[in-house]
Amino acid sequence: RRGAEPVIAPMLRVEFADEIEVGLSRISALLFTSPNGVRAWLSGRSETDLPAFCVGDATAAAALEAGFSKVRSAGGDANDLIALCEARLVPGRHRLLHLRGAHIAHDIAGALQARGFEVDEAVIYEAVAKDQLPKKAAQLIRQRELAVALFHSQRAAVAFTALVEDADLSDHLNTVIAVAISQAAANGLVRSDWAAVKVAETPNENDMLGRIGFDL
């Protein structure tokens, strides 16, 4: 829309669990903290009748697309999801199931358990760092044609930093603006010398794009 050419360059490869063996008879709601969690669930299970409590709008959109009809979005981060559960569910009455990846930035289950909820967890996918930078991304960085880089998680930021170092391209980032979805994601970029590192005020794509508009 602003004349920029977007390039998608995944830093992580998502691997779904071969089997998802969890019982749902006592579960009142499913908790999703990424679209990958929704996709992983649907890769091994077909149940979409339970309420889906989602960390943000992108995850909620993925749940709706997957066939969930009772979807609530916290519109933010892990703390917002915890607050949403507290507002809509009752400890001791509602048992929850957090469907998550192998690596977590926040212990949502532990936080909800501390508030009196019964919470089960199931690891249903893993995001694995790639072995090298995607060719298009490496080319843009090497030719100093990259203007802005968006980072949607801390693990993606850490993986990018390592891969850039492996490719001996770290000194090519000093003209690039990095935009991170959260401070945690920004913390994964500290080893690189960027033109600037911007952090979204709220953890969503629209705010990240707004930060780009501020600079361009």
Pin down the residues of each PLM region.
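Signature of uroporphyrinogen-III synthase
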Residues: 1-216
